[in-house]
Regions:
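Mature, structured domains of secreted/extracytosolic soluble proteins
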Residues: 1-247
């Protein structure tokens, strides 16, 4: 796909399983890590690419001068470093495998969107809330959407998206996951409440669209073999299943 220029930033998946970040304000195009002079270079460069082709029937070619770089920070590390209170709550719920630096409910064969509450929001909410371990688990998993990477560029359609929360309609033999209604828009992601009002708007900022990845290699490769598997957005309200538009 190609950028349409509507959002401040657009996220275009490449053939290697990573994302190119298109800044429609500055014109810069980069990978999920800063662009450098030379592969894995120390000098960071910015700037728009130069279009070379104008009449191709299956794409457009650009000259970028420097090397795109792609981060392989894991979802576990990203949440641990940027949302320590949420990370610790996941651990308390028994959902982490700390010895392996991973969450037990995350699969390397799936993609995710995570709406991670900030430390301040969680501290305020938890001050007046007591959770059992089972409730804590359900609460944490409500913030994970599986099967889609939703950015603030409006490329996904509005609809009910499957979370990792085990729904009450599940049985001993069948697991049903709760779904939450999401309206991806231009420079924001909107969540209605159960009455059709506003629950939360997540506006594009430096605290949104943080991309995590998986390193498929040993770490000794000249060219890193990584793919993107999750995007994380900071949220200033916790996700409460009973208050949101869910099914």
């Amino acid at each position: 796909s190609s950028p349409n220029g509507l959002a401040r930033k657009e996220f275009i998946k490449n053939r290697a399983g990573n994302y190119l970040v298109v800044d429609n304000q500055s014109g810069e195009v980069r990978g999920t890590a800063p662009t450098t002079i030379g592969y894995r270079g120390s000098v960071v460069v910015t700037g728009p690419p130069t279009q070379l082709s104008t009449n191709a029937d299956n794409g457009t070619t650009y000259d970028i001068k420097s090397w795109f770089s792609f981060s392989s920070s894991s979802l576990y590390s990203l949440i641990q470093n940027n949302f320590p209170r949420f990370h610790n709550l996941i651990r308390q719920a028994g959902l982490s495998q700390d010895a392996y630096n991973r969450y037990s409910f995350i699969s390397d064969n799936e993609i995710y969107t995570v709406f991670a509450p900030t430390d301040s929001v969680l501290n305020i909410w938890l001050a007046d809330t007591t959770l059992t371990t089972a409730q804590m688990k359900q609460f944490c998993l409500m913030h994970f959407v599986q099967g889609k990477m939703i950015f603030t560029d409006g490329r996904q359609s509005p609809g009910y998206y499957e979370t990792l929360r085990r729904d009450e309609t599940s049985t001993e033999f069948i697991t049903v996951y709760s779904k939450v209604y999401i309206e991806p828009g231009i420079d924001l992601i909107h969540f209605p409440d159960k009455s059709g009002g506003d629950y939360i708007d997540i506006n594009e900022s430096g605290a949104t669209n943080r991309i995590a990845g998986i390193n498929l290699g040993t770490g000794d490769e000249v060219f890193a073999n990584t793919i993107s598997n999750a995007v994380v957005h900071a949220v200033n309200r916790v996700f409460e299943h009973g208050l949101m538009d869910t099914r």
